[in-house]
Design a protein with these regions (language model features):
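Non-catalytic, conformational "gating/processing" segments within enzyme and secreted inhibitor domains
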Residues: 2-160, 175-262
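Long, His/Glu/Asp-enriched segments that create or flank divalent metal/ion-associated functional microenvironments
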Residues: 266
């Protein structure tokens, strides 16, 4: 709740919603907690009606300022939980559009791609040289928000850099960069990209398994019926230009309720 108030010149918005299929038995206490603490919008819909999918997609589109217009082909399950994030910030030190040129960019594949390369010279930025990479911090607005750009050293892969990321290391790197400023000649591609991913494997790598297993999941605070998470998808949009950055994300979680299984092993 404090993040949107950090900078009046930068937009940061978070929204939550819960969509309940028809009369699926979601506990009132669960709904009340989400309304009170997460400011969630909660609606009952008939997922079998095509208009329900449209209603949910429009909500996501509105909350992401049109950046993520479509997150569902067909509403499924018994309960859909959605979180959205939207960010729009202007650089403290904007790039001059007149300095933007078509140049080659070399992604992980090594195959060159022509891009619009932005250029900013003779400007001071927080900077740090780690063992495997260099990092520079580009601030927005009143300096409450910033983008940290990481450039692997020659011969070092992105994956090798990511493997060193931990909370402790990240704090140490940021602290080191805050204490050192460096005048940089900075080149950064103008970016507009969309990304969609099933993020259940990420949770599983973190040790979370039961929530996705119909035989083990415990959602008794949500419903008295057996329930499990069938799907978590995340949609993201990132736009980086000479003036600043727009970023949006929508994460959708499908929860399926199952009927109690009654085994009749004696005459009935």
């Amino acid at each position: 709740s404090n993040l949107p108030r950090l900078d009046s010149t930068t937009v940061f918005q978070s929204a939550n919603s819960i969509w309940i299929h028809d009369k699926s038995p979601v506990k009132d206490s669960f709904q009340q907690i989400n309304r009170q603490y997460f400011l969630a919008e909660i609606q009952n819909l008939d997922f079998s009606e095509p208009k329900s999918t449209g209603i949910i997609n429009r909500w996501a589109k509105e909350q992401t300022q049109g950046r993520i217009p479509h997150i569902l082909d067909q509403a499924q399950g018994n309960c859909i939980l959605i979180n959205t994030l939207f960010f729009k910030g202007g650089w403290i030190f904007p790039f001059d559009p007149a300095e933007t040129r078509q140049e080659n960019f070399y992604p992980v594949s090594g195959k060159k791609h022509p891009v619009s390369m932005m250029h900013l010279s003779d400007q001071w930025f927080a900077f740090h040289k780690a063992e495997l990479f260099e990092m520079a911090t580009l601030p927005y607005g009143n300096d409450s928000y910033a983008m940290t750009v990481i450039l692997p050293k020659k011969g070092v892969s992105i994956d090798s850099c990511i493997a060193t990321f931990s909370e402790a290391n990240w704090k140490a790197w940021l602290s080191a960069s805050d204490s050192i400023s460096c005048m940089l000649d900075l080149k950064l591609p103008s970016i507009k990209l969309d990304y969609k991913s099933n993020i259940i494997p990420i949770f599983q790598k973190m040790g979370i398994h039961d929530a996705f297993n119909a035989n083990c999941a415990d959602f008794s605070r949500m419903t008295d019926m057996p329930a499990y998470i069938s799907e978590i998808e995340q949609f993201t949009r990132l736009e980086v230009t000479e003036t600043g950055t727009v970023a949006a994300a929508a994460t959708i979680t499908n929860v399926v309720f199952e009927s109690e299984i009654v085994s009749e092993i004696t005459p009935y």
